[in-house]
Every structure is written in C-alpha cells, then in structure tokens.
Amino acid sequence: MTISVVIDTNVFVSGLRSEGGASRAVLRAALQGEVEPLFGNALWLEYRDLLARPVWSDITTPQERDQVLAALAKRGRWVTIYFGWRPNLPDEADNHLIELAIAGGASAIITHNLRDLGRGELRFGRLAILTPAQFLEVKR
C-alpha cells in the first residue's frame, strides 16, 4: 500500500536543486510511485510560482519545468479541502499544509520547517511532521 504524503515546497525545491540528498530521494520516491504526493490548490500554486522564478531559467527550460510538474501530478492525488483548521500555526501561510494533509488522510508532511509546523495549537495524532531524512528512515 502506497502511503500518502504532503511534500512542502521547501522540500520540492531542494529536491530539484540538489544532485542527491534526502529531499531528492523524497522527490524521486514520489515520481516513482513509492509514495503518493497530495496536492491542493495552494500547494500546487506554490510549486508553479516557485518554478516560474527567473533563477530556474538559467538551468531549465519552461518545458522541462512543466514536465516535472506533469510527472508529479500523474503520481499524486488532488485533494479538495472543505474544512479549514485556522487559526492553528504561528505562520498562517503554512496552515494549508495541515489542512491538505488532514483532508487527504496523509501519513506525514515532509518539510524542512519542523519548528513552525510542529507548533500548532491543534494536534493531529496520526499525522507526522518529518524532515526528508526522518521520512526516509521511517519509510524503510
């Protein structure tokens, strides 16, 4: 059974920029169907907005960036969020990750931002907040 996860934008970008490492391994696992990434409107728009920044123009073409998103979309599941869990996190901009994970039944949010995502007022017992390295260790 494939586990569902939310891949935070910081892990997505790290995975694309690095030649190796835990973030790249998480992204590879998603692209190979080993985990099911969940997407919602806010997260998908973050992915697209980040890939549209000029820094990517030096190393990839728009078509290559679209191909990465298409491959990720093919392996993932789109989730509609019907209920907001707000206010919850210190950084309001991160709440959509929790809402996506809960709505989609994710096992984990994979992020480099443990400090903010782990400090929510609400606790969701079955949802783990993990770094890419922690997730890979648990996944084994």
Indicate residue ranges for each PLM-predicted region:
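Short, well-structured N-terminal submotif of metal-dependent ribonuclease cores
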Residues: 1-39
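Short, active-site-adjacent cap segments at secondary-structure transitions
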Residues: 12-13, 45, 116-118
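Residues that scaffold the ATP/ADP-binding catalytic core of kinase and kinase-like folds
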Residues: 15-16, 50, 59, 120, ...
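PIN-domain endoribonuclease scaffold, especially VapC-family toxins
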Residues: 29-84
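Active-site neighborhoods of divalent-metal-dependent phosphate/nucleic-acid chemistry enzymes
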Residues: 74-114
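Short secondary-structure boundary segments
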Residues: 9, 41-42, 112-114
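Acidic, PIN/NYN-like endoribonuclease modules and their adjacent C-terminal/linker elements
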Residues: 95, 102-108, 114-140
